[in-house]
Each structure stands twice: as C-alpha cells, then as structure tokens.
A protein has these predicted regions:
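Hydrophobic h-region of N-terminal signal peptides that target proteins for export
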Residues: 10-18
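Catalytic-core signature of thiol
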Residues: 21-286
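Enrichment for repetitive, rod-forming helical segments
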Residues: 9-10, 69
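Sec-dependent signal peptide recognition
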Residues: 2-8
Length: 286
C-alpha cells in the first residue's frame, strides 16, 4: 500500500501557520505546543548551497528508517547532489540551455537518485573536496554552468552541430574534483557494501512514497508536472484540494509518519533567523 507521506505545496509558506502578520505579532511572540513528537535525526547544515531539497528529503528518509525499526543513519546529501547535478547538466546541454541549471531540486530527485545510484553514509562521501568543512557552492554552481554553456556554444559552431565524445567525461571530472571520486565499494560498521547494496539494506521501499500538491490551475485528483524551475526532470505530482492536502498531513503525523515538505523560503512570510513560516491573513505586497 502506498503511503501519502511526501508533500509539496508552493501555495503555503511553511508548516507553522498563525493568524497574525509579522507586523501585528503579539508582543510576547508566538507560542507553540508540541502536539505530536516523532523520531528524527539531528539537523544538518547545508550552509552556502541550494540543496535544501536533498537535506530535507534525506532527513525524512532517515526518520522513515527509524520508524521502520532501523538504525539511526546519516546519509550523504552530496552523493545525491553530485549525481543529480550530472543528470541535470546533461539535460541542460541536450535542450541547448533551455532548462534551469542550478543546484535546486525537489524531493523526487532524491528518490530517483537512490534508485539510480544507490546511497552511502555521510562518512563515506562527505562531498567536500574543495577546502571547506561545510558546503559552499558559490564556485561549483558557476563552474558547472560555465562548462555546460561552453559545450553548447562550441557544438553550435561545428558544421555538424555534434557534441564531442569527451564532454560528459569532462563534466564528471569537474564533479569529481569538487565532490570527490565516488567509491564503488566501502566498509561501514564492519560490513562491506556497494552503494546499491547499502540502499537495498535499508528497511524502506522507495516505491511507497507519493508526492501531493494543491494548485487550482490543474484538475484535482490528477497528476501533473509542477511548473516550477526546480522541477527540472518534469516529474509529476498528485493534485488535491487544499483541505484534503492538510488532511493527508494530519493523518500521516497522527499515524506516526513524518513528511517531507517542499516550500519557497523566499516568501515574505518566512524568517530563517527566527525559524518561523507564517501565512498572514492579508496578502503581502510584492
């Protein structure tokens, strides 16, 4: 039975909602009560990288592993990011640049990444091969974009418009330089694994998870490819009415399932420093 656990919604700002706007907040501030506490792993720092989609979804899967009776794990975000970046750059070149080539992504990218490339623990592949102890993608993003654009431009100048046979190897060379070479085998907690066998050892089935959203420009109870730049792979999500969307969340939490929530932290109702996401009564201008 498929479990409606993965949730994505761009109409709301965050899980924490309140009736007051930030400008009219009560002097004592917002008060929160723990209603349901579920097992989770420690929060990780994505630092200067647009990889929230990967950190949040792997955190969700780590919680799912705990729920299923598995051990507490710290899975490698950069393993997924590195592999998805390769796929995204290839598609960007194939479409002659008509695709969003940035580090952003969505929850289904993580599920696809594990299915296609397996997964490894953080200690096996931290993905920090460039002199920093936390992710910093200022240079990585610029280099990958410049390389892909150069490949497109050079191909367009050739009489046959062909790409060279070396460009994907060059892309992999850039990714390996920044993230590190990907291990084919590794030893973890006394056992030898491949990335695929380690993924297979986890007590979860990636086919069990479904993405939901709530938009009014597509029919409800149908799938559609959400039209946002980060959905670079054009994966589909199920569209349901907003009240049912919230019921899915409440029901999942009540039955002991955590969720993965995709949202837009650039909205004015979100404060990173205060750790609050607020849906105001009145529309915010701009």
């Amino acid at each position: 039975m498929k479990k409606p656990i993965l949730a994505a919604l761009a109409l709301c700002y965050a899980l924490g909602a309140a009736a007051q706007t930030p400008d009219t907040a009560a002097p004592e501030g917002y008060r929160f009560t723990d209603v349901k506490i579920l097992p989770v792993t420690p929060v990780k720092d994505q630092s200067r990288s647009g990889t929230c989609w990967c950190y949040s979804t792997l955190s969700f899967l780590e919680s799912e592993i705990l729920r299923a009776g598995g051990p507490e794990l710290d899975l490698s975000e950069m393993w997924i990011v590195r592999n998805i970046y390769f796929e995204k750059a290839v598609k960007y070149v194939r479409l002659h640049g008509s695709l969003n080539l940035a580090v952003g992504g969505q929850a289904h990218d993580v599920l696809h990444g594990i299915e296609a490339y397996g997964i490894v623990p953080e200690e096996v592949y931290p993905g920090l091969n460039y002199g920093y102890d936390k992710p910093n993608f200022d240079e990585i993003d610029a280099v990958i974009k410049a390389y892909a654009d150069a490949v497109i431009k050079a191909g367009g100048k050739r009489s046959d418009s062909r790409l060279t046979t070396a460009w994907q190897a060059g892309l992999n060379g850039i990714l390996d330089a920044y993230f590190g070479p990907m291990p084919g085998k590794f030893t973890y907690r006394g056992r030898e694994y491949t990335p695929a066998s380690f993924a297979a050892s986890l007590p979860i089935d990636l086919g069990d998870y479904i993405e939901f959203t709530s938009f009014t420009h597509h029919p409800f109870y149908t799938e559609f490819a959400m039209e946002v730049p980060d959905n670079w792979n054009w994966d589909k999500v199920w569209n349901v009415p907003l009240d049912e969307f919230m019921q899915i969340i409440d029901n999942s939490l009540e039955k002991g399932y955590t969720i993965s929530w995709g949202t837009d932290v650039s909205e004015k109702g979100f404060s990173r420093t205060k750790g609050l996401g607020i849906v105001p009564e009145a529309d915010l201008e701009g």
